[in-house]
Amino acid sequence: MEDSSNTIIPSPTDVGALANRINFQTRDAHNKINTFMGIKMAIAMRHGFIYRQGILAYYYVFDAIEQEIDRLLNDPVTEEELQTSTILKQFWLEDFRRSTQIYKDLKLLYSNTFKSTESLNEFLATFQKPPLLQQFINNIHENIHKEPCTILSYCHVLYLALFAGGKLIRSNLYRRLGLFPNFEKLSQKELVKKGTNFFTFSDLGPTEETRLKWEYKKNYELATRTELTEAQKLQIISVAEGIFDWNFNIVAEIGELNRRELMGKFSFKCITYLYEEWMFNKDSATRRALHTVMLLVLSIIAIWVLYFLVKSFLSIV
């Protein structure tokens, strides 16, 4: 967003701005996760159950972050928490809250499984989180309790990522309506709107979302410019670097858990999933491993076909 002097805050060339420093230090990790997430999103867009698992995982991630934001805003105790609370109040708006938005998406995505709000809430409260996801959630709470200022790492990396990619993801989802349960009374437009709240920051349209993004970036910079020590800024940057690794790991964990489950069932869904993993994955080692698995799967299919052909032939004879 531009101010009255027609200058963007922070300026892209402002090497002292905390946001720019985070971006510079995490540039390689950012490129790596972008490529990885692009592959995984392409696969998830073809399998609704995988997409739903990803949305569920990030519900818990953002819920953990926003629990800490609420605690720091409403009940700061230590001097460091009071300092962070003052900073948060300068840029945080309820429009940015994601956990309640993701919850709306989960109500739609799980509507065929949980017919009432109570049953969905019970599921969310008792769901056994995968190990790495649980570790990430624990790490969020531990980091912020130890160094309250590190909440600013999550505010920068995760929320700005949604601002940047939300519109693109909504567009892709519009072309993949098979991800959502069928509702006779909802049009395609209504279905996408009800299932993409996670990626939507305003119902007023893209212009308002762009304004909110620049407002967020501007106020984040103004709030952190002089309120933090250099040591605190370095700690925020360090935690920001780790967030990319955690994102990579929890998404990879979803893929690995699905691969194990589908291989155990050996179904058409298993074959299509493995094929798409092989098609979209550019990592040579991963491609070789998946190629080996695909050959094994095809060999098993060939043996089955041969078995039934021989059995049919012998029954005729």
UniProtKB/Swiss-Prot annotation:
Subcellular location: Endoplasmic reticulum membrane
Entry note: cofactor: Binds 1 heme group.
UniProt GO BP: heme catabolic process; heme oxidation; intracellular iron ion homeostasis; response to oxidative stress
Disulfide bonds: none
Cofactor field: heme
Induction remark: By iron deprivation.
Recorded GO MF terms: heme oxygenase (decyclizing) activity; metal ion binding
InterPro entries listed in its UniProt record: Haem_Oase (IPR002051), Haem_Oase-like (IPR016053), Haem_Oase-like_multi-hlx (IPR016084)
Superkingdom classification of source: Eukaryota
GO cellular component, as recorded: endoplasmic reticulum; endoplasmic reticulum membrane; membrane; nuclear outer membrane
Membrane topology, record value: Single-pass type IV membrane protein
Coiled-coil stretches: none
Functional summary from the UniProt entry: Plays an important role in the degradation of heme under conditions of iron deprivation.
Name listed for the protein in its UniProt record: Heme-binding protein HMX1
Gene for this chain: HMX1
